Amino acid sequence: MNFVLSLIFLALILKGVQCEVHLVESGGGLVKPGGSLKLSCVVSGFTFNKYAMSWVRQTPEKRLEWVATISSGGLYTYYPDSVKGRFTISRDNAGNTLYLQMSSLRSEDTAMYYCAR
């Protein structure tokens, strides 16, 4: 969690046309156990409100873990038991932004967090 900002550039080939998708995460930092943190991910390069979005994390041991998913309209959210009741995923479709509010943080939540389509 000590990595403050990560930037992901993905190149997609859609129907023979190259398209650049940008996902820019921010809000990371060092937090003591029991603390809270809110991450955000600003998206461009695709129609944000047409896709479900997720947060995933990579642990210090390089293990990938699914953290949360939200439906395209924001009505439905899904979490693994490990974060249920502590993490809240949300989205602002007008602002093309995905959020992850994390509370009651534990040492096992230490990871690099990424938004994903």
UniProtKB/Swiss-Prot annotation:
Disulfide cross-links? 41-115
Tell me the PANTHER family matching this sequence: IMMUNOGLOBULIN HEAVY CHAIN
Origin: domain of life: Eukaryota
Keywords, A to Z, come to: Adaptive immunity, Disulfide bond, Immunity, Immunoglobulin, Signal
Q: Where is this region: Framework-1?
A: 20-49
| A GO term from the CC aspect | immunoglobulin complex
The record, for Gene3D superfamilies, names: Immunoglobulins (2.60.40.10)
Q: What is this protein called?
A: Ig heavy chain V region 5-76
Q: Name one GO molecular function term.
A: antigen binding
Q: Where is this region: Framework-3?
A: 86-117
Q: Is Secreted set as a keyword in this record?
A: no
Cite any additional comment in the entry.
Answer: This sequence belongs to the VH7183 subfamily.
Q: Which residues form the signal peptide?
A: 1-19
Species source reads Mus musculus (Mouse)
The record's listing under InterPro entries reads: Ig-like_dom, Ig-like_dom_sf, Ig-like_fold, Ig_V-set, IgHV
Example GO biological process: immunoglobulin mediated immune response
According to the record, the residues making up region (Complementarity-determining-2) are 69-85
Pfam family name, one: V-set
What are the coiled-coil residue ranges? Answer: none
Complementarity-determining-1: annotated segments: 50-54
Q: Where is this region: Framework-2?
A: 55-68
